[in-house]
Structures are given as C-alpha cells and as structure tokens.
Amino acid sequence: MTLRVGVIGTGMIGQDHIRRLTQVLSAVEVVAVSDIDGARAAAVAPQGADVYAAAGDLIRSETVEAVVICSWGPAHEEQLLDCIAAGKPVFCEKPLVTTAAAALRVMEAEVAFGRRLVQVGFMRRFDADYRRLKATLDAGVLGAPLMFHSTHRNASVPEGLYTSDMPLNDTLVHDAYISRWLLNDEVTGVEVRVPRRSRRGGELRDPVVVLLHMGSGALVDVEISVNIAYGYDIRGEVSCEEGTASLPLRPATVIRDIHGVRQPVPADWRERFIEAYDQEFREWIVAAAQGTATGPSTWDGYAATLVADAALRAAESGALEPVRMCQRPSLYGPTLEAAR
C-alpha cells in the first residue's frame, strides 16, 4: 500500500521533504504540492503531481490521504484545522502554531475528532544517539536525572532573517522538547541570561543561556550560540544520582595525522540529523497509513509554544517566568508526572 501525500510549502525544508519522500523512502508518493509561489511549486512538484494554488484545496482533494505542512508558521493553524476537519493525518513542521491560543484551538479540534492526527516536526527523538540516551535514562540504572546540560550551536544564521527573539522562540524549542522527552517531565518555569554578545552576531541576542525548571525539580541548562563559526555542534549530558550519560560527538570519526588529532564538525542541521529526519518520516508514514499519528503531538507543540513565550518574557524581566499549562487531555497519554 502506498500513502498518497500532499506537501504544503515548497521552501528549503519543503523541498528537502519532497526529496526524502520521493527518493529515499518507500510506501509513499507525493501526489500534490501547494505554495503561495505557484511557479516554485510547479518547478519542484514531482512528475504527475497536482499543483494547487490554495492549501485548502490540496487538503480536501480526494487523491490526498495525508498532508505535510512546511508553510509559514502563521498559516499553520488554518491548515491544521482543515486537516483535522478532513480526518487526514498531518505532519507539521515546527512551529505547530505561533501562539498558545492557536495551539489550544488545534488541540481542542483534535480531541473533539477523537483520534490523534497531528505530528510535529521535532526530529531529535528519532536520532539514534538520543534514543540510546533515552533508553539509558528509562532503564533507571543511573538513578533519577538531576540535571541536563544541552548545547545548541550554529555556525551562522541568515543575516536579516534571524531576529533576536529567534534563539528563544525558534531555536530553543528543539532543546525544550527533547528535555521534556528525555526526562519524562514538564517545564514549569524559565530563566534567561544573556552574556557578553558575540561580535559575529551584530545586534542579535547571542549567545543566550536558558535555565528550564522541570516539574520534578530537575534543572536543564541550554546554551544557544547561533554564530559560533566552526560548525553545527549539538551536545547533551544528563547528570543523574549515580552517574552521567551523554551524547557522543558526531561524526564519530577521529583523524590523527601529522597535524595532530581532530574530529570533523557537521556543517549544518541537515548533515547532523539527516538520518533522524528519514526515520521521523519513516515512522510517520506507517502511522499515517493507519489513519493516525504517533510521534511528537499537538500537546508537545503547545508545550513548546508556552516555553518559548516564557523565555521571551524572562529575557526582558530577568526573572523566573512560570509556564502554566492546561490539563493534559487523555488523548495525549498520561501526564508526565503520573508516568514517572
């Protein structure tokens, strides 16, 4: 059985997902694309795929069984609600939506539908290294997790397109999600500290240090540096009661020659997480073919929005800003407190 997919948004990430769905993965076919730039959509559409000017028409098409949303964030709410109304599984790139109120509306619609349909594009949980780290923590051999040190470094970001809010409302959401998933815990408060600014970042608020207070009492510190020049460097170490567990450096190859010892650093997120992206979609295809979703949920997208909002407030106030979540609907499983 082949899942017939429509892709909304044909920018960089949309084109990468079209490539993945058409050239890398099996049991899936891209049968439709849509973009506000009709010429670009037509240029990247696979042979035989329909091109739609309006995303809603793609979603309602009888030939489309599932949808991938890669459009501009403010357009996500309407597109997600249309997918839920049509009963079609949907993969939505982050952000789920741009406001907590919008996240609640999407969540209410999905709960009313009665079955999970939405998966959000938090890909780190599909990375083999993160999965091994998660398995170690869940086994309990190191005792309870006490602290998680997360590092998120980019060589550079697009000048003029990446704003001072984006380390907190765009970059941070990956670290916030993976912290919740690894520790099986919710964020209850956020602090932000801004050290000396990097001269490479101009007027950007860069780097930043974020402290996430978790419901269990564990703490997560996140370093975000988006103009560090040398590459895309993702690190993580969990300190537990009886030891530590950390991610390996990637790629794992260590070179020794006349110049010394060195280890290459990935150039960007695609190089570091390409296998995670493939696995993310591999699992989504299986679930979508069954009419549902199993990966990061609307609840996770809602939580990420609240954490980002609190981080922006904390950057301005200098205080610990609370994260107040609504009661978790049973559709998204037990509360993390109950699961511990």
UniProtKB/Swiss-Prot annotation:
One Pfam family linked to the record: GFO_IDH_MocA_C3
Catalytic activity: myo-inositol + NAD(+) = scyllo-inosose + NADH + H(+)
GO MF annotations in UniProt: inositol 2-dehydrogenase (NAD+) activity; nucleotide binding
InterPro entries xrefs: Gfo-Idh-MocA_inositol_DH, Gfo/Idh/MocA-like_OxRdtase_N, GFO_IDH_MocA-like_dom, MI/DCI_dehydrogenase, NAD(P)-bd_dom_sf
Keyword annotations of the record: NAD, Oxidoreductase
GO biological process, one term: inositol catabolic process
Top-level taxon of the source organism: Bacteria
This enzyme's EC code(s): 1.1.1.18
Enzyme class, first EC level, given as a word: oxidoreductase
Keyword match Metal-binding: no
Functional note: Involved in the oxidation of myo-inositol (MI) to 2-keto-myo-inositol (2KMI or 2-inosose).
UniProt family annotation: Belongs to the Gfo/Idh/MocA family.
Quaternary structure, from the entry: Homotetramer.
Protein's name according to its UniProt entry: Inositol 2-dehydrogenase
Record organism: Sinorhizobium fredii (strain NBRC 101917 / NGR234)
